[in-house]
Amino acid sequence: MAKPAVFLDRDGVINVDHGYVHDEHDFQFIEGVFEATAALQRMGYLLVLVTNQSGIARGKFSEERFISLTQWMDWNFADNGVEFDGIYYCPHHAEHGIGQYKEECDCRKPKPGMFLSARDFLNIDMANSVMVGDKAEDMMAAEAAGVGTKILVRTGKPITEQGEALATVVLDSIRDVPHYLLRVKK
């Protein structure tokens, strides 16, 4: 039986977006992220990370460095009782990529490739799933993948009119997501 998921962008949702974050010393968790994700898991949602990482494509850091940071991040969540069900990332950029990463792909948001891969692998009920992101591209990818609820948070990039128009709701941060979902899913 398909299960609903909460899809989470990384930079601006899980951590403060300092621009091309690739080192543990620059990785600052958003306040309340561990409590919020633990609550979402208790509510029965799968947790799936979906993140564009054009810093890899641009040569700002290696894919290995990203994977190492992601493992460190994942361990921090595990230490706080939270397990990700899936971690998906796009290392490509069609314009600014170099070498093998200069590619027009289906995984880079606003395209829905990461969402569809997660749906197929984890048997996700997309209509009852949620996207939490900080940009219009997050909302566009979620819409294209059939995600039912799209939440834009103010902890990342400035909210645009386009992002706000595509979102179901705009909240201050991920820490507000469980309370919102409990209110609307009653």
UniProtKB/Swiss-Prot annotation:
Group of enzyme by EC: hydrolase
Localization of this protein: Cytoplasm
Domain of life: Bacteria
Name this polypeptide is given: D-glycero-beta-D-manno-heptose-1,7-bisphosphate 7-phosphatase
UniProt cofactor(s): Mg(2+); Zn(2+)
Enzyme active site: 9 (nucleophile), 11 (proton donor)
Organism: Vibrio cholerae serotype O1 (strain ATCC 39315 / El Tor Inaba N16961)
CDD domains named among the record's database cross-references: HAD_HisB-N (cd07503)
InterPro entries, A to Z: HAD-like_sf (IPR036412), HAD-SF_hydro_IIIA (IPR006549), HAD_sf (IPR023214), Heptose_bisP_phosphatase (IPR004446), Histidinol-phos (IPR006543)
Pfam family, one: Hydrolase_like
Annotated site, Stabilizes the phosphoryl group, chain positions: 51, 109
Catalytic activity of the protein: D-glycero-beta-D-manno-heptose 1,7-bisphosphate + H2O = D-glycero-beta-D-manno-heptose 1-phosphate + phosphate
Location (main, coarse): cytoplasm
Family the UniProt entry places it in: Belongs to the GmhB family.
GO molecular function per UniProt: D-glycero-beta-D-manno-heptose 1,7-bisphosphate 7-phosphatase activity; magnesium ion binding; zinc ion binding
EC number: 3.1.3.82
UniProt binding sites for Mg(2+): 9, 11, 134-135
Site feature location: Contributes to substrate recognition: 108
A single GO cellular-component term on record: cytoplasm
Binding-site residues, substrate: 9-11, 17-20, 51-54, 108-109, 135
Residues where Zn(2+) binds: 90, 92, 105, 107
Function: Also catalyzes the dephosphorylation of D-glycero-alpha-D-manno-heptose-1,7-bisphosphate in vitro.
GO biological process: ADP-L-glycero-beta-D-manno-heptose biosynthetic process; lipopolysaccharide core region biosynthetic process
